[in-house]
Amino acid sequence: ISIYKKTDSVYQKVYEYEKTAEFTHAIYGGMLCGHPAAVIGHRKGERNLIAFSWNKAEKKYQAEIIDRDCGPANVFHYMKDGADRLISANREIDEVALYTLS
C-alpha cells in the first residue's frame, strides 16, 4: 500500500506501508475522527483493516490497525451520535462488523 502526492504535475511516492497487503479491498477515503484518512483492508496475508492518516505532530503518515485477520471486502462509514462508525463486510471470516472509532 503506497501513498502518492502530486507535486509540480508529477505524482511521487511519499509513503509505503511496511508490510505486504495483498488483494486490497474495503476502501474508504474521507474524514475519520476529525482528520482526513483512508481505510484499506486486504483479503490475503494478514487480512487486516487499516486506517492511514497524516500525523501532524510527527510530520509523517501513520497506519493504525482497526482489526486483524478479518479479510474485509467492503467498508461503509457514517456518523451517529457524534461518533465515527465503520461497517465492514469481513468476507474471509463470514462476518459483518460494526466499529465505533474515537
Feature locations, PLM:
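Beta-propeller-forming repeat regions
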Residues: I1-S102
